[in-house]
Amino acid sequence: MVLSKVACFITFSSLAAAGTLYSANFASDFGPFSTCNVKAPSSATVESGELKFFFDETNFDGTRDDKGVEICVFESGTRTNVKQMAKEGWQGFNIYVPSDTFPTDKHTIFSQQFCPGGCSSWCGTLEIAGNSVVAEHRAACGDPTSATIVQSISRNVWHKVVVRMKVSQSGAGAYEVWWDGSLVYSKKNIDVGFGDWSSDTLSSGWYFKNGQYAYGMCLCKVSAGLEDH
């Protein structure tokens, strides 16, 4: 693992997560989202309708909170994530990746679907790998199904992203991604998700996260953001 300083800008806009619908246009604040898994000087800031993420890896301490900066929806008065869905959910946002402050040779997750239950808990992710976008999903604590869904990201422009995940342990699940209005990945009639099941529904729930999870460390600066269009 190479440790360094990472400053990246990714920009998101019109962020919505449903089950229960949570959305924000970032006109003045994060609401109803909160920053999570972040340690200063890394930060998320709202500027002119954009949510900008800045990740600085200097003096990395090995903790999860020092691997990026993300946003979550918490239960009132707690730091516990709201379990937004039990079966099917949709996650939509716009993302902007700049050419001057985001690297082309690193790995950064920017969209996550979490199924609380150990082993890092994620059951689906979208990540920037080099200059490609990779989708991953899994039905247990093990190796995921992985596919490159965008070969080369066009930088300095906004991209519209929609993720649909339907959990199942009986072959009735789905994982789909739309990029700029086109369906670029679709897997149906699959197993996806894990946790406590009841009639093929996750009684333990699942939820979304957005931001930067720079699990692949680098010697660079990276920045990112979200905006309402």
Predicted region positions:
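Low-complexity, Ser/Thr/Pro/Gly-rich disordered linker/stalk regions
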Residues: 2-4, 17-159, 165-229
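Sec-dependent N-terminal signal peptides
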Residues: 5-15
